[in-house]
Amino acid sequence: MGTALSVPAQTQSARVRAQGSGHTIQTAITIISIVLVGIALIPALVQMFLDKPLYYPDARFTIQNIVALVSDREVTATFGATFLFCSIVVLVSMALGTSSAILIGRTDLPGRSAFLAILLWPLFLSPQVIGFGAILAYGPAGLLTIWFSDATGLTEPWNLYSVPGMAVVAGIAATPVTTLYCLTAAIQQDPNQEAAARIAGAGSLRILFRIILPIMRPALIFAFIMNIVNALETLAIPLIIGGPVGIKLLTTLIYDKSFESAGLPQYGLVSALAFALMAIVGVLFFLQRLALRQSHRFVSVGAKSIQPKMLALGSWKWPAFLLMAVYVVFGVVVLVGAVFARSLTFILSPDVSFFDAVTLQHYSDVLSVEVYRRSILNTLLLAVVGGALGTAFVAAVAMVAQRSNYRYRRVLDAVAQLPRVLPGLVVGLGVFYASMFVPGIDLLRNTIWLVLIAYLIRFLSSGYGIVSPALLQITGDFDRAAKSVGAGWTTTMTRIVLPLSKQALLSCFVLLMILIIKEYSSAVFLMAPGSEVIGSTMLSLWTQGLAGPVAALAVMQIVLTSILTSIVTRILGVKLHG
């Protein structure tokens, strides 16, 4: 009897040991995650309450930096300009993105696939490239501005150097995100409701406004909030377009106060502004969660053996095609084309023949000047290494948070999503401070590895948003079956769960590579000889008036993104959309 009872006891003990075998790893992953996010937050938080830079031994406690948020006229003026900027960006992006998604995904518009491919270009381009292209094409001396003025006689047909002007450009840069969110929601709908409406005699417009758009409401809310967040965080477009004429938004004020040429940089005010920005973003994400709590009311789940029927545009087919073509050509192709053209000429002007101005000197400089070449190599290295390390770290975090019984898994889940509310400037500022005080990290100062840490913090939530849902879709029966034969948590994750999550992990890798190549704001505070990246180098060159090398670097950034994404998508079979 005693022997019979001891066998189950021993088996149960073995299973408990197997189940708990991953506790040390889970704890380590949790601690590393908290430390990384803490690096971005704590130093900047402390600086907000000091009257001098954090590294000054005589710095004293003060709340003046917080008071300045509501008392300083320069600061309060930026809130008004930022509100106007964000409003226009959201209006442009939502209007263009939603319309494009419906026309491409749910109508019989001619050339839908070609339009979608071109519409997504800005998704893979840094906002800096879009901004440079806008200045070259639509600035006061831009090609299209001069051509339009000559044709119509208008001396100033539009004003790019204004809050509405740069907001339209930023809205165009943000449109692909709205298009993707809405396109997926428009396509993946139960066709039975539309079929019933057609049987009842409803036409295309009635189906659109009474069925398709209401079901798309969660995607529209998500896109709306994301557009506001992106508008609040954007730095490059307001800096290169609004900076020369004195227009300041919240992000550009943070940038200016950090690099003041006269006097000491106001790091305390910078930290207060950064946390104000983070608080606004945090409130927006909270409102998004509230708005989407009842999102299931707008989703129909049914048999999808047939594809939703395309809405017939009828007599509006070719006018819609023309409007879409105008947007694609003048809102995307012209901007990218202007950058390519400027990279191949010493001057870009209607008064000078393109072929007379052709030169390869800018590319020669980019490939021969040490700083330019190093920024390209650093960006390539960070994209590949950062994408791989980031994916591995995201996978580890997601497995602990979603596929374990670890006591603090909910805390880890919250920590992993916290960087969503951290703008790139806040992350860069926090890592900058940490490099001066945190033992170990100070050894990485002025190296690309410090930039890599900032990137990993910045994009933790982005990767987590891809991998976490994929892990939740894998049944827990695999975990239970593995435990029944004595497999520990680590073995179960590495031998079963991770292989089943291959597609999500590859998608995460591609996304992180693209985001790292595009990123610039996190590296602004970390720029140093030897740690240059393409984004920060372009900003520096533009402020010096070197448009040619900037355009060549922008083209190199486009080419680098295209090559890496093409290789990965073709070899690994990852889909970039759909």
List each model region and its residues.
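Alpha-helical transmembrane segments of integral membrane proteins
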Residues: 11, 15, 287-324
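Membrane-water interface segments at the C-terminal ends of transmembrane alpha-helices
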Residues: 21-55, 69-187, 215-236, 240-242, ...
